[in-house]
């Protein structure tokens, strides 16, 4: 990524990430489609409200993997093979520990968290069952993310795409087999998801154990290396804290939606699956930018990093808004695919039409955050999102949205806080402090 056409490198990296995330989102949607059509609206509500709670427990560690990917990309850009090997094996060690911790925490805390979120009693048993099975196999999600982060750090976004395609096909087949064929409930949907995630993790690690590159994994070398671990945590903890505070704020939003009953939960849960498609270009370019910026700053290509940042941010904005407009226009039909109940469709459509035209604000915030992480300034997006997406969003929900008694006021929490974070990121990005941060840090050391 440090030589040749800037835009080609970014697009070639982002496209496989986009397609991989698309397949991942499709199998999340299939879960909800099968559950909603075969098991009804209460079961759909149980599964549909899952994303925020899962991200609450996984977000901290996934942020640290983002930091690990930046560290590996920097060593890779600087042609430091020994540094790459040390960072890779430290990342794998961290992934194994993280998987065990999240499994235990998820299984034990699920009932308390769901009750705290105000989950209706009619939905609670299915929610607990689904989450406990899901968290029982969460280590496979962590290990796949570990492998994908290593591939992406060295500029390989194709192999994660292949593994997600396999995982998606396995998930669709098992969803239909377990739920439609064997007559299982939400436990069948959860089990299908766990097995499909295990398949993608196994494929990723098999490839990493057989590559000839400096990022090859040797399990006998998997251990924590103190200096590298500190680098991972220095870059990763701000991203992890950022993920966690966003998740906490979104759980508060979800708990406000839960107050309006199972139909609102089912409708908004259906929209959240559709919203994932809006996030595809945003996430793809944010990852591409973090890797591109990391490698080019590692190679001291500062002007190239600046040009790449501008190009990637613009592409992310345009693509996110195109998807947002499409979802806005097709919202009633899209929601009806999950469940035909008019109330479910009405709630999901209302949320979609409140927020989707503002996807460009979400895209800008995430893209600039990707640039900052690649530049080693992960603390900046953490602070911006702590204030805008947590403190202000939760305050708005508690002081304005709940007092109004109008669910649409809950939905407005998202575009309002996206706008505020975009203003903050724009100011910092234009100052340009991020570009030479690593150079100043190395000089000071």
Model-derived features: positions:
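Short runs within selected transmembrane alpha-helices of multi-pass transporters and secretion channels
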Residues: 65, 134-152, 160-168, 189-202, ...
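Small-residue hotspots at the loop-to-helix junctions and early N-terminal turns
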Residues: 39-52, 127, 131, 190, ...
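N-terminal transmembrane alpha-helices
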Residues: 2-38, 52-67, 71, 96-103, ...
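Transmembrane alpha-helix boundary and packing residues in multipass membrane permease domains
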Residues: 17, 21, 33, 37, ...
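Helix-terminus/linker motif at the lipid-water interface of multi-pass membrane proteins
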Residues: 26-44, 114-121, 177-184, 244-273, ...
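Small-residue-rich hydrophobic transmembrane alpha-helices
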Residues: 44-104, 141-160, 254, 268-331, ...
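Short alpha-helical transmembrane segments in multi-pass integral membrane proteins
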Residues: 1-14, 72-137, 181-237, 293-358, ...
């Amino acid at each position: 990524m440090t030589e040749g056409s800037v835009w080609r490198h970014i697009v070639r990296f982002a496209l496989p990430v986009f397609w991989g995330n698309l397949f991942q989102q499709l199998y999340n949607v299939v879960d909800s489609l099968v559950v909603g059509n075969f098991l009804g609206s209460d079961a759909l509500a149980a599964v549909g409200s899952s994303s925020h709670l899962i991200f609450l427990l996984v977000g901290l560690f996934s942020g640290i993997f983002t930091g690990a990917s930046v560290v590996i990309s920097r060593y890779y850009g600087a042609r430091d093979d020994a540094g790459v090997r040390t960072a890779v094996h430290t990342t794998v060690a961290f992934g194994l520990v993280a998987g065990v911790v999240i499994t235990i925490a998820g299984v034990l805390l699920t009932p308390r968290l769901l009750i705290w979120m105000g989950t209706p009693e009619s939905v609670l048993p299915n929610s607990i069952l689904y989450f406990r099975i899901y968290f029982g196999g969460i280590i496979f999600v962590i290990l796949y993310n570990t492998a994908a982060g290593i591939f992406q750090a060295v500029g390989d976004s194709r192999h994660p795409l292949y593994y997600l395609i396999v995982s998606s096909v396995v998930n669709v087949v098992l969803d239909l087999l377990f739920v439609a064929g064997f007559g299982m409930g939400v436990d069948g949907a959860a089990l299908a998801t766990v097995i499909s995630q295990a398949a993608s993790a196994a494929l990723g690690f098999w490839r990493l154990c057989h590559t000839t590159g400096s990022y090859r994994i040797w399990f006998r070398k998997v251990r924590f290396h103190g200096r590298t671990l500190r680098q991972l945590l220095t870059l990763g903890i701000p991203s992890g804290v950022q993920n966690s505070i966003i998740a906490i704020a979104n759980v508060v939003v979800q708990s406000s939606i839960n107050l309006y009953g199972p139909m609102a939960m089912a409708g908004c849960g259906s929209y959240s699956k559709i919203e994932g498609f809006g996030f595809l270009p945003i996430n793809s370019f944010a990852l591409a930018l973090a890797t591109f910026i990391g490698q080019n700053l590692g190679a001291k290509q500062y002007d190239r990093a600046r040009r790449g940042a501008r190009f990637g941010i613009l592409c992310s904005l345009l693509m996110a808004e195109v998807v947002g407009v499409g979802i806005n226009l097709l919202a009633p039909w899209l929601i009806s695919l999950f469940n035909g109940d008019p109330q479910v469709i009405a709630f999901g459509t209302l949320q979609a039409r409140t927020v989707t035209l503002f996807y460009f604000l979400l895209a800008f915030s995430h893209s600039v955050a990707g640039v900052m992480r690649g530049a080693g300034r992960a603390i900046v997006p953490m602070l911006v999102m702590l204030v805008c997406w947590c403190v202000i969003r939760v305050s708005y929900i508690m002081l304005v949205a709940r007092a109004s008694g109008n669910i649409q006021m809950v939905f407005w929490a998202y575009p309002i806080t996206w706008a505020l974070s975009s203003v903050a990121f724009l100011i910092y990005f234009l100052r340009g402090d991020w570009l030479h941060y690593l150079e100043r840090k190395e000089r000071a050391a």
